[in-house]
Each structure stands twice: as structure tokens, then as C-alpha cells.
UniProtKB/Swiss-Prot annotation:
One of its GO terms (molecular function) is proton-transporting ATP synthase activity, rotational mechanism. PROSITE patterns: ATPASE_DELTA. InterPro entries: ATP_synth_OSCP/delta_N_sf (IPR026015), ATPase_OSCP/d_CS (IPR020781), ATPase_OSCP/dsu (IPR000711). This is ATP synthase subunit delta.
Length: 194
């Protein structure tokens, strides 16, 4: 099998690299510094369209990718030089293994590892209408009680769900939307008729 082809799904690759970085920096005790350096790099990457296209392009050699990542990291004003060097080395490893196109997913997965270690979770809430401050607070407190950690709410207003909520935390979802209930009722009625 060639080095440029892998049967491992990319999200799994993202998680493996992210977990490896997290384990290393956790052992060294500098998770916060590395987290800030990762945020600095992601900010530069997300602001620079040319760099974004370069990272996602499969047409550059490993040598070119390593050289560009090293140059980019040298030009970023990292708050902590040592953390910046660790991120730079990590990016060179990613490039050397032909995984640079997965750098967004890897670094975001690293951020999720850090949040999970702090027992911080993001809950995506889809609501038919905006929630009041009191509803947000009650929802947050309820989720924190169930999850056993700090919950950050990411609220999306989507009138097409008609009413109720859809709550997503990690791979779990609770769907109490009126749209889903009506769809279920429609299916049940179709089964009864046929």
C-alpha cells in the first residue's frame, strides 16, 4: 500500500494526532501554553486564504510543506516561544506524514481534548425561537447536572423545527422538536393505513 493512501477515516486520524499531542503536553504540564499557541496558529491559518489553500492542496511535496510550516511558525508572534516551537515541530510531523490537509481537524480535535480534560462541553441547542436568559440559564444548569461538567451553549434559531428543542452534546442528541414529533406521527399513520 502506498504512503499517500490510507484506509483510516480522517476523523480518526484527527483524533489520533490530537490525542498524541495532548498526551505529550499534558505530561510536560504545559497544556495551557500549547493551547494558546494552537489558537495563534489557527487564527493565522483561518485569516490567510493562500495559506489555507496551500495546507489543503495535495500538490506540494513534503519538503515544501515542512518548509512553509516552519516559515509560518517563525513569523507568528507566539506568546510563549517554547510552546510555539512545540507547535511548529508538531506541524512538521503532520506534514512529514502527509496529513497537513487534516491540520484543521487535528488542531480542533486537540482543543476538544483540552476542553474534555477540563470537563468543559459545548452543547448545540437548536430552537424554533430565541431563548430567554432564564431559559438559557436553566438549560445550562440542567445539562451541567446531567453531564457533570461545565457546559457552553451554542444556540441556533431554526424556525423550521416549529417548536421544542434539539440538543447535541458530543455524539448524543435529544430531539424534542415538534417537526420530529409530527414526522413520527406521519410515519405511524402511514403504517396503520397500509
Amino acid at each position: 500500500m502506498s504512503d499517500s493512501f490510507s484506509l483510516i477515516p480522517l476523523p480518526l486520524v484527527d483524533q489520533r494526532y490530537a490525542q498524541a499531542l495532548f498526551n505529550c503536553v499534558q505530561e510536560a504540564g504545559n497544556v495551557e501554553k500549547i493551547e494558546r499557541a494552537v489558537e495563534d496558529f489557527l487564527f493565522v491559518l483561518e485569516q490567510n486564504e493562500d495559506l489555507k489553500h496551500f495546507v489543503l492542496s495535495p500538490f506540494f511535496s513534503v519538503k515544501e510543506q515542512i518548509k512553509v510550516m516552519q516559515s509560518v511558525c517563525e513569523n507568528i508572534k507566539f506568546a510563549d516561544k517554547e510552546a510555539g516551537q512545540i507547535v511548529s515541530n508538531f506541524l512538521r510531523v503532520i506534514a512529514a506524514n502527509r496529513r497537513l490537509s487534516a491540520v484543521f481537524g487535528i488542531l480542533h480535535a486537540f482543543q476538544r481534548c483540552v476542553a474534555r480534560a477540563r470537563k468543559q462541553f459545548t452543547a448545540q441547542i437548536i430552537s424554533a425561537r430565541p431563548l430567554s436568559s432564564q431559559q438559557k440559564q436553566e438549560l445550562c444548569e440542567t445539562l451541567e447536572g446531567v453531564i457533570g461538567g461545565k457546559v457552553l451553549l451554542h444556540i441556533i434559531v431554526n424556525p423550521t423545527i416549529l417548536g421544542g428543542l434539539i440538543i447535541r452534546v458530543g455524539a448524543s442528541q435529544i430531539d424534542t422538536s415538534l417537526l420530529t414529533k409530527l414526522s413520527s406521527l406521519k410515519l405511524a399513520l402511514k403504517k396503520e393505513v397500509s
